[in-house]
């Protein structure tokens, strides 16, 4: 285009020069003629005419205004470059310009007139020559323009970087366009020169006009927000492939702005464009697409796959929600004169978008920002390599209308360049959109498209895998088959490794206690052989597979949650938990509500025990619940009562039902309470008599008193006459010099000796021998020990009295007497409802019990007073006046009980000591069975006697 611009400038200059010369000659002729036709009455003013102000000088390089494009119609294509309208300048303008009027008479008088023939020829020839030159210029311009369009027909129409637009940062690009085209206010002419540039991700080389290279306002905003590097570096050219028209999508190939269905989780960004395809190219593309579709159908591609690569429409209204961080895209019309606004709007309508608004000015085509990428769900289609799919898609389309999705961060291989000079460096690649690295990305070249990787473990695509040159095979099927074989070989080679690393499914645990293997003994587990039993892996995984809670829930869970039954409309009066408890109690009691109601009406406690009445008393409802149950009408209410509510409602129909239950419970427990109190008071009376009349206990106290006085001689604690029974518990704390014998041991042994001697003296049946005095003494101790050990049995009621509590007994008596008031209250309430038939029966039963209960309560109260008085007397009997200081009335029985337990333990120890002493005495002094019987072997016995005498004499001699 620089040569065309230079030629047009020379033509315009020539036209202007010729127009000026012709105008001057015409002026001279006009002046000469006007001198011949002067008016009869010239102007009276002698002042010279004021010359007209000169008009603005035409620019040296006049601007060529571009009219707005005409509206597009269905049957007509609007050229991308509108026809240039030349300004009305040059010779034509000079001929149409009128000569200045005014007084030129002075000048005409000075000049000499020429011949009319010599002056008319230039005035006629020069305008004709000007028109001819102008027509030739216009014809040459359109011829050159048509030639450029024919040469650029195979260019990358609609491809980013396919024209001669200067790719700069969006802000610098807009400033550069305004400076070059004459500013933003005036009409600007498109650049005449064209350069071929290539942008990252494009595969075609085309011509692009500056008008379509400007980004849209939304694109500028997105680019400003993203920010690109101002550094421009040239990229090596790609192979001779072109981007297809916007929306072009070959079936099964996934090109033209759409990703292949088998592209897996990898996402590509492909800039979109639109261009016209020639008839031959369309025919070839249709044939190749049919072949690829047949091959894809034979491989049964996955239906319903979702496109993972977004498509960018060229209309600003095509995208309703632009992504803020998506990179701006540029598109250039590669086929000048064949691409129109209608074609862009039609391509947008192909995707089901709303109709595009009116076309923008030619110098500011708008492109919406790309929508965010959508992720493709896993499909059951067989895995395939994205590199193979992209290569087959490349072979199935022509080199003029193919859009291959590529990674925007990978440089393509260099194609042959045919630029006129060194191309300026293109802009840096746009940054990835938001969430690009978080999406599931797998490495290209692997054959596992169904692999699901976590975002943290998925590495980005390797640039080295894309830099390798693709094989230029004319048949796409052959390339796909080779790739399939390679993928199968790779899968076969790594099959063993994948099987080894595949984790087994987790099964349900078996809780047991493991036993450690022992190397020093033979165990049953050592007899097991490894080949004796084989686990059926398939069966055990089917039966006992475990579904962990943190794993993803399956579509159809194996274990369904138990479906809770729909809540019924019953159990709305009582609390659900209370109603359930009442129903459980009724089933446990195994009684019907009719039986309970009859017993309450009659006051009969013979058929029901205290346990049943206590359970009924626990079922008593609150005041609010009682009101609800009484006012409930089952016939008119939609709510159904449960078994517990029905039972309580039937019971509440009886007057003061639960007060009757309380009175009947008192009657049922009356006999047992009276018997318990009688026995308790009798035990207290007997315990007091035992302590007062126990001879052995008194002798034990005497022994302790004498021993204590002997030990306390010379102190202020000596010469005691009595002591509190608490001293008996301190006897075991005083130990002898050997550390084992206590003061209680000494007292017991003394009592044993005295009691044994009394028993032996009273028992004269056993003759005493003077030869064995030690044996007789041991026998006496044994008899005395039996007497002392029997003291606990003698004071058995004292032990029972020690387990009683005076406060508890008093409360029982008070409760028993207070229960009579319940009976009287029930009788008073029954007087008010004597109109009922069952009221008389209840009244009679209550009156009969009331007479008998009054007598029993009086006797129990009298017995209580007697028992407490005896306890007080026995306490004073042992403690004297200090009995008033006792906080617990029955404490004396507890002290005696504790002493008896210690005494029993000491008696057992003394008995073991006596047994050892008796055994040792028997060995040293053998006693014949009958000394009057003759000996069988007298000589042997005499010999033994002599030997024993010699030994005794020897020991006696050696002892001093």
UniProtKB/Swiss-Prot annotation:
UniProt xrefs under Gene3D superfamilies: Formin, FH2 domain (1.20.58.2220)
UniProt keywords, alphabetically: Membrane, Signal, Transmembrane, Transmembrane helix
Gly residues bias spans: 101-110
Topology relative to the membrane: Single-pass membrane protein
Family, per entry: Belongs to the formin-like family. Class-I subfamily.
Name of the protein described by the UniProt record: Formin-like protein 1
GO biological process: one example: actin cytoskeleton organization
All residue ranges annotated as the FH2 domain in the record: 497-929
The keyword Hydrolase belongs to this UniProt entry's keyword annotation: no
Chain intervals with Polar residues compositional bias: 214-228, 271-282, 300-318, 387-396
GO MF terms held by the record: actin filament binding
Ranges of Low complexity composition bias in the record: 328-338
Source taxonomy: Eukaryota, Viridiplantae, Streptophyta, Embryophyta, Tracheophyta
Organism of provenance: Oryza sativa subsp. japonica (Rice)
Signal sequence, start to end: 1-22
């Amino acid at each position: 285009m620089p040569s065309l611009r230079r030629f047009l400038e020379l033509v315009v200059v020539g036209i202007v020069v010729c127009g000026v010369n012709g105008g001057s000659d015409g002026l001279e002729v006009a002046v000469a003629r006007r001198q011949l036709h002067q008016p009869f009455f010239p102007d009276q003013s002698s002042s010279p005419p004021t010359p007209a102000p000169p008009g603005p000088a035409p620019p040296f390089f006049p601007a060529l205004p571009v009219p707005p494009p005409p509206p597009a119609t269905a049957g007509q294509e609007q050229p991308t470059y509108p026809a240039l309208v030349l300004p009305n300048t040059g010779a034509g303008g000079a001929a149409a310009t009128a000569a200045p009027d005014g007084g030129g008479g002075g000048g005409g008088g000075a000049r000499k007139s020429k011949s009319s023939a010599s002056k008319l020829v230039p005035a006629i020839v020069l305008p004709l020559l000007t028109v001819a030159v102008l027509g030739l210029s216009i014809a040459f311009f359109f011829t050159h323009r048509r030639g450029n369009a024919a040469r650029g027909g195979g260019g990358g129409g609609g491809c980013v970087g396919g024209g001669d637009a200067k790719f700069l940062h969006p802000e610098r690009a807009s400033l550069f366009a305004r400076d070059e085209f004459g500013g933003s206010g005036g009409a600007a002419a498109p650049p005449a020169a064209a350069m071929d540039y290539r942008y990252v991700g494009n595969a075609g080389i085309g011509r692009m006009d500056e008008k379509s290279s400007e980004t849209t306002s939304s694109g500028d905003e997105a680019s400003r927000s993203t920010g690109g590097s101002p550094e421009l570096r040239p990229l090596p050219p790609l192979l001779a492939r072109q981007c297809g028209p916007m929306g072009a999508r070959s079936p099964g190939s996934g090109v033209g702005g759409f990703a292949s269905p088998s592209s897996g989780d990898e996402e590509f960004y492909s800039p979109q464009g639109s261009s016209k395809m020639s008839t031959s190219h369309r025919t070839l593309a249709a044939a190749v697409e049919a072949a690829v579709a047949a091959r894809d159908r034979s491989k049964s591609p996955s239906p319903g796959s979702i496109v993972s690569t977004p498509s960018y429409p060229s209309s600003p209204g095509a995208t309703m929600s632009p992504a803020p961080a998506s990179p701006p895209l540029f598109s250039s019309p590669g086929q000048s004169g064949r691409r129109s606004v209608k074609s862009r709007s039609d391509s947008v309508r192909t995707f089901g978008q709303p109709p595009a608004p009116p076309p923008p000015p030619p110098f500011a085509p708008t492109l919406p920002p790309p929508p965010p990428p959508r992720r493709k769900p896993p499909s059951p289609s067989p895995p395939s390599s994205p590199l193979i799919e992209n290569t087959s898609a490349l072979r199935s389309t022509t080199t003029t209308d193919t859009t291959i999705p590529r990674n925007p961060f990978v440089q393509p291989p260099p194609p042959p360049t045919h630029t006129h000079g060194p191309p300026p460096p293109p802009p840096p690649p746009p940054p990835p959109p938001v969430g690009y690295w978080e999406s599931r990305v797998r490495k290209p070249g692997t054959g596992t498209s169904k692999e699901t990787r976590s975002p943290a473990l998925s590495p980005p695509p390797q640039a080295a895998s894309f830099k390798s040159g693709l094989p230029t095979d004319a048949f796409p099927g052959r390339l796909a088959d080779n790739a399939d074989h390679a993928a199968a070989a790779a899968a076969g080679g790594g099959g063993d490794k994948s099987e080894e690393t595949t984790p087994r499914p987790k099964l349900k645990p078996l809780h047991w206690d493991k036993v450690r293997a022992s190397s020093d003994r033979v165990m049953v587990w050592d007899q097991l052989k490894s080949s004796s039993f084989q686990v059926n892996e398939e069966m055990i995984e089917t039966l006992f597979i475990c579904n962990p809670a943190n794993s993803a829930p399956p579509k159809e869970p194996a274990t369904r949650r138990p479906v809770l039954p729909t809540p019924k409309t019953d159990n709305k009066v009582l609390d659900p938990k209370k109603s359930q408890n009442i129903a459980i109690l009724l089933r446990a009691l195994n009684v019907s509500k009719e039986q309970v109601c009859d017993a309450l009406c009659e006051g009969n406690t013979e058929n029901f025990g205290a346990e049943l009445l206590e359970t009924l008393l626990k079922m008593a409802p609150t005041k609010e619940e009682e009101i609800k149950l009484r006012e409930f009408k089952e016939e008119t209410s939609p709510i159904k009562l449960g078994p517990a509510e029905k039972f309580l409602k039937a019971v509440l129909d009886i007057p003061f039902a639960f007060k009757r239950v309380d009175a009947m419970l008192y009657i049922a427990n009356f006999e047992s309470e009276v018997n318990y109190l009688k026995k308790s008071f009798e035990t207290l009376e007997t315990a007091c008599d035992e302590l007062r009349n126990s001879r052995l206990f008194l002798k034990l106290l005497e022994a302790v008193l004498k021993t204590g006085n002997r030990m306390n001689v010379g102190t202020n604690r000596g010469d005691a006459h009595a002591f509190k029974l608490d001293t008996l518990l301190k006897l075991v704390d005083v130990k002898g010099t050997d550390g084992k014998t206590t003061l209680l041991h000494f007292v017991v042994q003394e009592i044993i000796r005295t009691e044994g001697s009394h028993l032996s003296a009273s028992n004269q049946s056993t003759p005493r021998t003077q030869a064995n005095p030690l044996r007789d003494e041991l026998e006496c101790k044994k008899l005395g020990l039996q007497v002392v050990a029997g003291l606990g049995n003698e004071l058995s009621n004292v032990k029972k009295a020690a387990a009683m509590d005076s406060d508890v007994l008093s409360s029982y008596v008070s409760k028993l007497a207070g229960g009579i008031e319940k009976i009287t209250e029930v009788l008073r309430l029954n007087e008010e409802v004597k109109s009922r038939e069952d009221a008389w029966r209840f009244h009679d039963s209550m009156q009969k019990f009331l007479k008998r209960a009054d007598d029993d309560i009086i006797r129990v109260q009298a017995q209580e007073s007697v028992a407490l008085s005896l306890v007080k007397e026995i306490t004073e009997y042992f403690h004297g006046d200090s009995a008033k200081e006792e906080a617990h009335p029955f404490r004396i029985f507890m002290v005696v009980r504790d002493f008896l337990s210690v005494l029993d333990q000491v008696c057992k120890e003394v008995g073991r000591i006596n047994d050892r002493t008796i055994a040792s005495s028997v060995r040293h002094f053998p006693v014949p069975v009958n000394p009057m019987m003759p000996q069988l072997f007298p000589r042997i016995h005499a010999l033994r006697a002599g030997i024993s005498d010699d030994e005794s004499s020897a020991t006696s001699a050696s002892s001093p």
